[in-house]
Amino acid sequence: MKKRYESLDVLRGLTVAFMCIVNNPGSWAHIFPPLKHAAWVGCTPTDLVYPFFVFCMGCAMAFSFSKYEKATSKAYLKVLKRGALIFLVGFALNLYPFFPTSVHDQTWTFGQNYLYWLQHKRIFGVLQRIGMAYAIAGCLALWLKKPGRILAAIGTICVAYTGILLIFGRDPGAFTLEGNVSMRIDTWLVGGDHCYHGFGGTNFDPEGVLGSLPAACSCLLGYLIGFMIHGSQKNMSALCQGSSHEGSMPSEAVNYSPDRVVNRTFIYGCLSLILGIVLSIWIPICKPLWSVSYVFYAGGWAMLTLAFLAYLLDVKGYEKPIVPFKAMGMNALMAFVFSGVIAKSYGFFGFAPARYFGANEYLSLLWSLIFASVIFAILWVLYKKKIVIKL
């Protein structure tokens, strides 16, 4: 198995563990406030799970793209194929168990009920947006290469996205549920029946097409941090090899040391967080819209968390206490797939968590922890067998 950046695996593992907890309560009626999403504007710890996942994907992208000396059609095709595969896996999760679990009309034939079921299945979803963001960010990273150009692309996309929301938004406001243009675009593209209906019965889909543009920016923020970390590791390795011949470590090695990398990641995280807060004066922090302020606010927290983990692992050498999260992070995408399949399979066994764990918030959280432990057990087996499943 090739060398991995362990701090990134641990961050992904923490994200996956928290995802399992917040997505699988014993009862949706009994959840502690920090484990709920903000209704529309605002950001709870739960609202950081998704952008952390996307940020980690971008960071890992920087390591995997280091093998491309130049952007070729083969490289672009590989990125697009992986993005499409992630999208299709997400859509397959929407379809699972691939047949209607209830009958819409008793007078209809099975074929009529099945067709109705297909006509009302949601197209988009979490993995679908991850796939779209990966494809956009990956192609831009291959094309632009240099961090300065990528940073300029992030700024351009953010300005363009906000401009689209403002120009085509309607009353009561461009950043509101009722007035945002994203809902109209998704309804036009796939039809209202194929959109999410969890926001007051509207057709607004929080994982729709337009919002995948700023999500790609979150991915590119991760790419920039990953690019910086990988470059530091590469330069340090080269200096170490040179010092083995000369007998002493060059003075410039301090620029690529783990603590210097931690400091830079921390500073970038603070700057991104501050930028997100400042932008929120005019553009609300809104996860459903993946607003520009949300991009930098969540990205800042992701950088700060990665800096903290890198400090523990790379500077202080604390590894054993966080090995379980490393195991979860090495198969992060599969953890999402496993959790989705298991949660949608309760009905096959006549099991309803709310029946046993739905009386209060404490029991509801207990079930979340049990569920997360089951996912961890599956991923631990894969980790011990050195199996990494990639899409």
Where are the regions a protein language model picked out?
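Alpha-helical transmembrane segments and their immediate juxtamembrane cytosolic regions
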Residues: 1-238, 243-245, 250, 255-391
